[in-house]
Amino acid sequence: MNTQSPKRPHLVVLSGAGMSAESGLSTFRDSDGLWAGHDVQEVASIEGWYRDPQCVLDFYNQRRREFVGAEPNEGHRLLSRLEDYYRVTIVTQNVDDLHERAGSSRVIHLHGELMKNRSVRDPFTTYPAEGATRELHVGDLAPDGTQLRPFIVWFGEEVPEMIPAIEATEEADLFLVIGTSLEVYPAAGLLGYVPAKAPVYCIDPKPVRSSYRPDLIHIQAGAVAGMRNLYARLTEGR
């Protein structure tokens, strides 16, 4: 069993869509600005919810079906195994549960968790998306009597988990970015909180650069191949 000893170096990981893509899940949006054929603003914004809640629910019902068939990839499993050597905190932009299913014990979900529901009134109390509530429809109510919706942070909503993500980053001994661009929020923003003494690794198949950390260590590879490389580096001699 993995342990999270406070005496071990603290590795903070920021993971994004490229991590889940290697498990066969759709990335956030493609080159034409669509997400699985949908306009992002129609299905992932609070305005879209007010306009057509059933359209939004149908979209996330389909995504849940997709998630159920996905499995953690080798990259997820290697991150979990690093808990044998490091105290690991994963800050993920992904709304799937692949990190948890791979065995990671501390995961902060910036954008929510699709396998949970919440009411429109209470953004903090969650309910498992299982059985009859795996697929949501207009009229499905939470115990507080209001409409159930996915536990997702949409465009136009606050990101409450950003505070614990920043706090974890400020305590990092090493920092890893995997599956997301350094040029967009929150990756660029979180990098500003990494202690100057902490090495920063970035796994990305494309060239990268950062104004925050020009000394970052770039592993030019996809998520799985890059994690094989990094795992070997971080466990050598341990």
Model-derived features: where do they sit?
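Conserved catalytic core of sirtuin-type NAD+-dependent deacylases
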Residues: 1-238
